[in-house]
Amino acid sequence: MKKNLLPGFIAIFILFLFSCSNKYYTASNFEEKTENHKVVAILPAEVTFTGKQPKTLSPDAIAKAEERESIDFQYALMNSILNHANTKKYITTVNFQDINTTLKILEKNSISVRDSWNKDDNELAKLLGVNSVIRMNIRKQRYMSDEASYGVGVARQVIYKTGIGSKVPVPSSVGKTYDIYASCNLLSDNQTLWNDNYKRSTDYDVQPNVVIEWITDDFGENFPYKEKRKKR
């Protein structure tokens, strides 16, 4: 009996590993294209809020919130990349332009945060004096208010405590506030050299800064420009 169960457990374990693995793209000629790269700049992230927006917020207020999160994502990605940059096994082969320097150069050239989202990647790289740029695209699809999400969460707990939940399953996604879709691209000469993407649902009890850390930590961990340390 135990021998018959073993293959099933192994299959489930392998499926679990594949479901947890992160799939990202790296260009086949990445090493060739980046051989002479020295400096990389992180651009302000393009952040858009879609779905049911709060009635108390004007379009202008929503736009300002998008731009604030744009900068938050920019700084958070820098921190994440640096946190994962040099390990016992790997070293990072490029330097990163300071975020303040990037923003000052854009401002000096009359390029706002929002304007930078639509500027040509190659032109921005030349303007910033870097070999490649990193772009993030974040879309936050809102389904309900935090208050409504909280109410659904409480109702779900009541259902489970009464025992009804075991007979009538309640999907965990019912009370979600947002679906977040994120992508991160490394671009040089208008070519995508590396890409990673991320999707996650959140509800009322997850703070925005936590979501930003989740996403950027994933991108930072998988970011390229790494080579194995040479043994001494």
Q: Model regions: which residues?
A:
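Contiguous N-terminal and early-domain "leader" segments and peripheral loops that mark the onset or edge
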Residues: K2-K3, C20, V40-A41, P59-A65, ...
